[in-house]
Amino acid sequence: MKMEEAVGKVEELIESAAPPKASEQETAKEEDGSVELESQVQKDGVADSTVLSSMPCLLMELRRDSSESQLASTESDKPTTGRVYESDSSNHCMLSPSSSGHLADSDTLSSVEENEPSQAETTVEGDTSGVSGATVGRKSRRSRSESETSTMAAKKNRQSSDKQNGRVTKVKGHRSQKHKERIRLLRQKREAAARKKYNLLQDSSTSDSDLTCDSSTSSSDDDDEVSGSSKTITAEIPGRGCFLN
């Protein structure tokens, strides 16, 4: 829009410069006649050619900018980028001093337009960095939750294995009457077996005591018999000695 307005202003300036020249031609006609009219027309043509020769660079640049703006408006899907002007030594319009002053506005506009996409790129990079940080935070949370669940599962497995090894079993649900009767019968059988073992141990201990008593009495009787026989022997020997004497 700015470039189109500039083109309109240039055309208005050219049109405003044309009427005084026409008035000058009319005065020349009144004063000098037809010969002077032809000379004035030639002079006007030369002046117009000089003006146009000094202005073509600006017109070319304005037309180029207007065409580029139209292309940018038609291709709205594509991202806007700054204009890059090629500087060639053969392009006398870009190097001419007359066009340098008029092109200052276009240069500033191009620099502004170049800065805008750079700012947009920086904002996009900031957004991507924020998104990447958010994704990293989510991944860390997921990894923490997964590690916690794995540790909890490992603890449960260890507890269950310890209980199984230690024969610690919990009965789930309500026990039936038959199950209770079976448990009671098993307890009675265990108690009866324990009593039998205790009685057998007591019987074995009593029999051992009886055997020890019998052995002690028999040993005492044997000692008495041995001592009595020895006495008789000793008594008989002196009598024999006396008899021998």
Swiss-Prot record:
Enumerate the residue ranges of region (Required for interaction with CSNK2B).
Answer: 202-226
Query: Matching Pfam families, A to Z?
Result: RNF111_N
Question: What high-level taxonomic lineage is stated for the organism?
Answer: Eukaryota, Metazoa, Chordata, Craniata, Vertebrata
For bias kind Basic and acidic residues, which ranges apply? 1-12, 23-32
**Keyword 4Fe-4S belongs to the record:** no
Region Disordered, as annotated, extends over 1-245
Q: What is this protein called?
A: Protein ARK2N
Its quaternary organisation is: Interacts with CSNK2B (via KSSR). Interacts with JUN; the interaction is mediated by CSNK2B.
> Which species is the source of this protein?
Mus musculus
